[in-house]
């Protein structure tokens, strides 16, 4: 069901322009909102209030920044990918490619930025039990990590199929003390894990905080997760000035739910000279029907508490998504991405499983960096993008995670033996 929010603006740490704040009903244009049971409305209001107070409390922001530096390892480097740049260079020049190295964070991906921030909020709210959903396992690992750090009970919901694909991350979560709860319903992937996590939250809302892992879900989650990840773009903006003396021309990131992309894009949304490109999973090809290209192929609908673009059949039922990447295997997307697409501020493309595999291998061989399969989707779009870019174009790709977790999947698909 839908509920309205008080007509009060929420203090925002990123000094946003009004055009990119969610409105009084938690909406980005027509997207977003709160489509949840009444049971959850007090918890969402409590979370929104706690976040607003926390961002205005120097003790909270100082602690967050201290942990981001000393525990997570920020700031992450902006790395010039010289051999990848040379690979795409033409006779008349070509773009210069930079990688924002989120793969170098503690736990190996961007997910720790949000998990850490929300864990601090949970402590502030007196919640001692944490639940989360995970697809590729990186958000689950990040959540289990911060729960271990702060002594919080941790339950991770993960689709049984994703547990098979990401067995290494399942072991990591358990090693960190988390309970990993298999979800066998539906396709046994991220959508189903999210649904089960929400059911748990409804039942245990008084004692439990749900650390949602993407810029999806009911308000205030899309804004909250975005703001904890905005450090990616804020650092990138400063690092670009230091590296080449101006803003980049193109920002690019993979998009499943969309948190790593929104973290990179958000501080640049008002800089209209900067192109924002999100890359989705085309799976076996969009025409095959087996894909997760939500923005490029979806229609507006409601899933997991918010209105956004979704993969739907002719009757409006949410369709099964497919991707070789467990982290992109989701039939929805964060509402702010849907909004940025609708107003023309961001562009979205889709690449197939095979294109992502080819890109993963290329980046590994040229740069000595094995990216996650999710991240490889962004790299794959360089094949189409680079021939269209003028000489000297500065391109920043968010290297959102490392590919250790995907080695077995890649070996299986490429026919290699480890």
From Swiss-Prot:
List cofactor names only: pyridoxal 5'-phosphate
This entry carries the following GO cellular component terms, namely:
cytoplasm
Q: Does the keyword Hydrolase apply?
A: no
Q: Which UniProt keywords apply?
A: Amino-acid biosynthesis, Aromatic amino acid biosynthesis, Lyase, Pyridoxal phosphate, Tryptophan biosynthesis
* Catalyzed chemical reaction(s): (1S,2R)-1-C-(indol-3-yl)glycerol 3-phosphate + L-serine = D-glyceraldehyde 3-phosphate + L-tryptophan + H2O
* Start-end of Polar residues biased regions: 1-17
Listed InterPro entries: Trp_synth_b_CS, Trp_synth_beta, Trp_synth_beta/beta-like, TrpB-like_PALP, TrpB-like_PALP_sf
UniProt modified residues of type N6-(pyridoxal phosphate)lysine? 111
Metabolic or biological pathway, per its Swiss-Prot or TrEMBL entry: Amino-acid biosynthesis; L-tryptophan biosynthesis; L-tryptophan from chorismate: step 5/5
For this protein, the Enzyme Commission number is 4.2.1.20
Q: Which family does it belong to?
A: Belongs to the TrpB family.
Question: Mind telling me what this protein is named?
Answer: Tryptophan synthase beta chain
Its ancestry begins with: Bacteria, Bacillati, Cyanobacteriota, Cyanophyceae, Synechococcales
